[in-house]
From Swiss-Prot:
It comes from Mus musculus. It is an enzyme of class 2 (transferase). GO terms for cellular component: Atg12-Atg5-Atg16 complex; cytoplasmic ubiquitin ligase complex; cytosol. Changing V4K: Reduces the amount of hydrophobic surface area available to partition into a bilayer. Does not affect the ATG3:GABARAPL1 intermediate. Rescues MAP1LC3B lipidation when transfected in cell lacking ATG3. Induction: ATG3 protein translation is increased by EIF5A. Coiled coil: none annotated. This is Ubiquitin-like-conjugating enzyme ATG3. The membrane-curvature-sensing motif targets curved membranes. The N-terminal region works in concert with its geometry-selective amphipathic helix (AH) to promote LC3-PE conjugation activity only on the target membrane.
Length: 314
């Protein structure tokens, strides 16, 4: 039944997006939405600092006139996913409800303190200097230094909206132990080793109706064979499956359909982050949008290790 409802909603939103005029005037600071031009600027910034992300065009017939032909959407491929969400030990302490007083019952962040369970996310820190412009340290160094550095726990909605938003995470874990454990299982030929070798292709598009970025993902098994929808749902927080995350057609690519993180809350979350930075005497530039965006969607896909940006500190 939920799939039918999502399908109807998806078709209605396609019509609504078609009829929605392109946003021309910046409303980033006021509402958290962005124009297509701002999306491109934020995408250029992401590509510059995280070269694993690249611009793409997609199908020629699906090119959007309000975006440059060669910058229709962003893509990063072969992103590792070593664990299923159900393999993350559940505890009431790990669950937080974001915006519980809204009409939809709030956004449930099931893994907002994943460091407790020993799950390490490959995330570095973004430095947000108080009363100064934002400085981003190049995250591409991860490719050369990931074996030498400790990596902080995953960022999430709870940190941004309810716990000071931009505080430094103290907990760090040695990821080499996790890698060694995975290798040991692989050498033993255990079934668990197969489950821990999935990869995902991730895409970021511009949603003209919601006027925000939108994340899409499609997964593959260890043989690079496409995962079924049910298997991809295993890598998504179960509180978001068929709610925040639905199966829809990519706006720039041919079928099969992909998992998509619904963008209806993105502008609201971004607006709160902007306000928090301003309260600390700083200013959040629109070029940082996608780097922050990739942070708060980790609550939805906590085991997909795509986010190589840095945490925020005030």
């Amino acid at each position: 039944m939920q799939n039918v409802i999502n399908t109807v909603k998806g078709k209605a939103l396609e019509v609504a997006e078609y009829l929605t005029p392109v946003l021309k005037e910046s409303k980033f600071k006021e509402t958290g939405v962005i124009t297509p031009e701002e999306f491109v600027a934020a995408g250029d910034h992401l590509v510059h600092h995280c070269p694993t992300w690249q611009w793409a065009t997609g199908e020629e017939l699906k090119v959007k006139a309000y975006l440059p032909t060669d910058k229709q959407f962003l893509v990063t491929k072969n992103v590792p996913c070593y664990k299923r969400c159900k393999q993350m030990e559940y505890s009431d302490e790990l669950e937080a409800i974001i915006e519980e007083d809204d009409g939809d019952g709030g956004w449930v962040d099931t893994y907002h303190n994943t460091g407790i369970t020993g799950i390490t996310e490959a995330v570095k820190e973004i430095t947000l200097e108080s009363k100064d412009s934002i400085k981003l340290q190049d995250c591409s160094a991860l490719c050369d230094e990931e074996d030498e550095e400790d990596e902080g726990e995953a960022a999430d909605m709870e940190e941004y909206e309810e716990s000071g938003l931009l505080e430094t995470d103290e907990a760090t874990l040695d990821t080499r132990k996790i890698v060694e454990a995975c290798k040991a299982k692989a050498d033993a030929g255990g079934e668990d080793a197969i489950l821990q070798t999935r990869t995902y292709d991730l895409y970021i598009t511009y949603d003209k109706y919601y006027q925000t970025p939108r994340l899409w993902l499609f997964g593959y098994d260890e043989q690079r064979q496409p995962l079924t929808v049910e298997h991809m749902y295993e890598d998504i927080s179960q509180d978001h499956v068929k709610k925040t995350v639905t199966i829809e057609n990519h706006p720039h690519l041919p079928p099969p359909p992909m998992c998509s993180v619904h963008p209806c809350r993105h502008a609201e979350v971004m607006k709160k982050i902007i306000e928090t930075v301003a309260e600390g005497g700083g200013e959040l530039g629109v070029h940082m949008y996608l780097l922050i965006f990739l942070k708060f969607v980790q609550a939805v896909i906590p085991t997909i290790e795509y986010d190589y940006t840095r945490h925020f500190t005030m």
